[in-house]
Regions:
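Bacterial Sec-dependent N-terminal signal peptides
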Residues: 1-24
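N-terminal beta-rich core of secreted/periplasmic extracellular enzymes
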Residues: 21-176
């Protein structure tokens, strides 16, 4: 009988502690809640200074997080055809890390010329893996529009002038 009472009490304490933990989880950390609700909850917990800091870069390609709320830094990178090697915070020179290297993929016009969506998927997966390895949160590319003018200095980041071809090649790239 004592054993049953002890097991019952233990089960009650365990259930109560699990229930209390789930109630204490902030809405912004609850993956089951809608994104809009999570964003509103996170914003309501942030100070004005923290909000301003998040929309103002702390260096090239980086915005600070809010460590007290568990919100990580945001790291961006150029790279619709390869992840940029690390650069110095105060100038555009390469950081010169001896353990730093990157894969330079062919420009997206070359990828589009293959007319191969499976290749675009593999290309996107490869870039995504390198971005994750380098702890990059946002990839600045690819350009998903079509060429509008030959004078656009970023045309190499697009997949050409043909909207049909672009749509067939960009989607698997992004999914990758």
């Amino acid at each position: 009988m004592k054993k049953q009472i002890l097991l019952g009490a233990l089960a009650f304490v365990l259930f109560a502690s699990v229930s209390a933990q789930s109630v204490d989880t902030p809405v912004y950390l609850d993956d089951t809640k809608p994104v809009e609700l999570r964003v509103e909850d996170a914003l309501s917990r942030m100070t004005l200074e923290e909000k301003i800091a998040m929309i103002h870069a702390q260096s090239k390609f980086c915005s600070p997080g809010v460590s007290r709320l568990g919100i990580p830094e945001i790291w961006c990178t150029d790279g619709p055809h390869g992840i940029r090697p690390e650069v110095l915070w105060d100038e555009w020179d390469q950081a010169g890390w001896t353990n730093d290297s990157c894969v330079a993929f062919p420009a997206l016009t070359c990828l589009a010329a293959t007319w191969n969506p499976d290749m675009a998927l593999l290309y996107g997966k490869s870039i995504g893996e390198e971005a994750r390895y380098r702890n990059k949160t946002i990839l600045l590319g690819p350009g998903v529009n079509i060429y509008r003018t030959p004078l656009n200095g970023r045309n190499f980041e697009y997949m050409g002038e043909d909207p049909y071809l672009s749509s067939k090649m960009v989607v698997p790239y992004v999914q990758g």
